[in-house]
Amino acid sequence: MRKTSLLNSNISSVISKMGHTDMLAIGDCGLPIPKETERIDLALIKGVPGFIETLKAILEELQVEEVLIAKETEKVSPELFIEIKEIIKDTKITFISHEELKKELKYCKAVVRTGEQTPYANIILKSGVVF
């Protein structure tokens, strides 16, 4: 059994194959996922699992150098935005429109779908290097 906290084999597999600047998205339950992008669907019921707990678990495994967030997030869901900033600390944030974020999903290695129902609870994580 794995010693690290992330137990989902699909997420672990995607992360282990990622290289520098590859992208992985985490989305709320309403985020449209392109057909060509791998969908890792964790959504069980409304709110489960949550976006923040999923983000925290993935960040324990993935080295991230930059995040892409919809610029609408800060205004529409300010509490979520503050929590994201606290979690990612000094990681570079690039703000793009929600429409641009949805277009970027086709370039992601996968999208992890949560049960989250907070508006704009979506993020793209750009992989960094550990050396």
Curated annotation (Swiss-Prot):
It is found in: Cytoplasm. Disulfide bonds: none annotated. GO terms for molecular function: D-ribose pyranase activity; intramolecular lyase activity; monosaccharide binding. The active site is at 20 (proton donor). Signal peptide: none annotated. Pfam families: RbsD_FucU (PF05025). InterPro entries: D-ribose_pyranase, RbsD-like_sf, RbsD_FucU. Its EC number is 5.4.99.62. Gene3D superfamilies: RbsD-like domain. GO terms for biological process: D-ribose catabolic process. HAMAP family: D_rib_pyranase. Belongs to the RbsD / FucU family. RbsD subfamily. This is D-ribose pyranase.
